[in-house]
Amino acid sequence: MSPLTRARRLAAGEAPVYVATRLYDPSGRYLGARLECGCLRGLRAGLEGLGLEGRDPLTFLPFRDSNSALQGVPTEEFSRAIYDLDRDHIERGFALLAPLGDLQADSGIAFEVGYAAGVGTPAVLLWLNFFVLRYDGTEETLLAPPLLSRLAARSENLGAFDLSLRFDGREDYLRRVAAALDEAEAAVAELCRELVLRPHHPPPLPAVAPAPGRVHLEFGGGQFETQRCWAARLQAELERAGFAVSVSRRYEGAGPLLERAAADLNAAAASELVVTLADGPDVDGETAALQGYARGLGRKVLLYSSGRRRIYTGPEYDHRHNLMLLYSADRTVRRLDEVVPAVRALLG
């Protein structure tokens, strides 16, 4: 599709920009709404520069727009309907804006970044950290975790809040926090104007078909010893069962992390089924992104989640993890010894 055709679909309200939003945190919803304001200004300015007049909706804001569209859906089907609606908007969106921050990237947003890359929608990472990441062994300095960086069409750091500043009391501190949000909103406006005038493109997809019976293990890329131990055990068990197995190892071995992250994505794309590890306070952001990428490419997904905690709001939301992770998986297992039988069942 040509850039002008894409811009015309945006202007007609057929391809709104998906502004990803943290689901559980009210501050995340506030931030998403603020960034959407900047996004709208920028989109309208960009369309005007092309001689086009934008017609609503130019943006899609999850939680607000999903819930509003699904009034009357039966309780037991509500969260599944949200997943389907959000996924549809990512697939046809002009772009995806992903506000991320903190040391644990939000798993739902990370999944959406990966899914966008898999279906060909450019994802823009908006980081709100005052810090960057450095990695032992390579001494690389990265704005975002390597796998997320590889999936994005563009990364921007909006985290201009400087911890070294001295503040003159409560009012000065509050004023500076508000000013930082104003600056972030303005930066998003300029970025979205540029997206319309000079479209970005998702990373090129691997030109490889999945090998029948091949399984890829995404247990965090080997950053922690427990991940490496569990992945090694499952690899041995799956190979004894006759499956060809690859393992994400971006944090092991030598070479630039971004290159190793690309190798993990290529290995997942070359597999018929991807097994992801969901254990932890939240699903690791890179693992969630790889799961989204695999699902976007049409690969099967097996989610391993041994946790006992449930996230409960009532019958409409009673889950162990973000609904994007749960509903995108073909099957979820609770114990390591269930993985091999589940792989057999999924791959026939």
Model-derived features: positions:
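Conserved catalytic or regulatory cores that recognize and/or transform ribose-phosphate-containing ligands
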Residues: 1-348
